[in-house]
Design a protein with these regions (language model features):
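Fe(II)/2-oxoglutarate oxygenase catalytic core
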Residues: 2-289, 293-341
Length: 341
């Protein structure tokens, strides 16, 4: 998440850090009333005293950058961003991703914005009834822990998500700090994991229907897969990050499937331990800004049966190719290239 060649906190890291709690500092004194308030022990902070629609000054932007690096995800409430303001804010932190394909609910004229609105655009997709689509999302890893676009060779560096319409209850999102999860492993397991790589593939864990399944055919025809290090070095903080999730990771390279399955289950359980997580209750006008290189998140699965819309808008910032502890970069397998969406 860089801008003008500078790291998100304005410094360059040596990349030698092995995990734990080395962070860019946060400063509540960057402007009148601006405060960064942690909300959990390892991850998450709420920032107050900032109007994101009012073109925050450079000092405030720097404080937000530092807070994202320190706390991995930051939250703002009561914001009045529109689509143009959302994109303009994102550009202060990096280059927004322009998606070639978006859902019908996404706003025209703003190709950087993707709108997630289950009730608006999922019914009838790929020959499925709306309730059938939601049922399979609930009962498969499509609702599982993930980073955004993790099967790409260059997953987004960060995501800025804005709430337009939220249900009166439910719909919370949960994030986990993967740097803290890595640091919490025992030293022998860290040393072992440092050497591993894994295949990340779109659609892992998807539950197909019997017979002709149009969505499975779609996934097979539009494969995206990369081999990533199982531990990546964060390009700005130098922290080692446990690069696992329940959606994209298919198998650890060089291991048998039973071995891979057992190790991935152990690592994912570590990555999602409650002490490394934070849960956010959305309100209209809420904004969450997270480091996609150091977190995974869990989309809510408790609203599909409710007759309440949940409309969210997101902008993702272009990322870099992950690098492992040995200095070796990720490698594309199929359907992906740096900067090509």
């Amino acid at each position: 998440m860089t801008t003008g060649g500078s790291d998100m906190d304005g410094t360059r890291s040596s990349g030698r850090h092995t995990g734990g709690e080395r962070h860019a500092g946060t400063s509540p004194g960057t402007g009148p009333g601006v405060e960064v308030r942690p909300v959990a022990g390892h991850i998450g902070a709420e920032i107050t005293g900032v109007d994101l629609a009012d073109e925050p000054g450079d000092a405030v932007i720097a404080a937000i950058r530092a807070a994202v690096l320190r706390w991995k995800v930051v939250f703002f409430r009561g914001q009045r961003l529109d689509h143009a303001g959302h994109v303009a804010l994102a550009r202060r932190f990096g280059e927004p991703v322009v998606l070639p394909r978006r859902g019908k609910a996404s706003p025209s004229g703003f190709p950087e914005i993707e709108t997630t609105a289950d009730r608006l655009e999922l019914g009838g997709r790929f020959g499925m009834e709306h309730d059938e689509w939601l049922r399979r999302r609930r009962h498969t890893l499509l609702r599982g822990w993930h980073c955004d676009h993790g099967a790409r060779i260059d997953p987004p560096a960060a995501t800025i998500l804005r709430a337009q319409t939220v249900p009166p209850y439910g719909g919370d999102t949960t994030w986990s700090n993967l740097a803290a999860a890595y640091a919490g492993l025992s030293a022998p397991v860290r040393e072992f994991t440092d050497r591993l790589r894994a295949e990340h593939r779109l659609g892992v864990g998807y539950l197909p229907r019997s017979g002709d399944d149009a969505y499975v055919r779609h996934l097979l025809d539009h494969q995206t897969a990369s081999e990533h290090p199982l531990v990546r070095v964060h390009p700005e903080t130098g922290q080692r990050v446990l690069f696992v999730n329940g959606y994209y990771v298919e198998q650890i390279t060089g291991l048998s499937r039973p071995e891979s399955r057992a190790i991935l289950e152990m690592l994912l359980e570590q990555a999602t331990r409650p002490e490394y997580t934070v849960r956010f209750r959305w309100e209209q006008g809420s904004v969450a800004f997270w480091d996609n290189r150091a977190t995974i998140h869990l989309a809510p699965g408790d609203t599909a049966h409710l007759d309440h819309p949940r409309i969210m808008h997101r902008v993702m910032l272009a990322g870099e190719v992950p690098v492992g502890t040995d200095g070796r970069a990720s490698e594309p397998i199929t359907g992906t290239a740096p900067g090509r969406w």
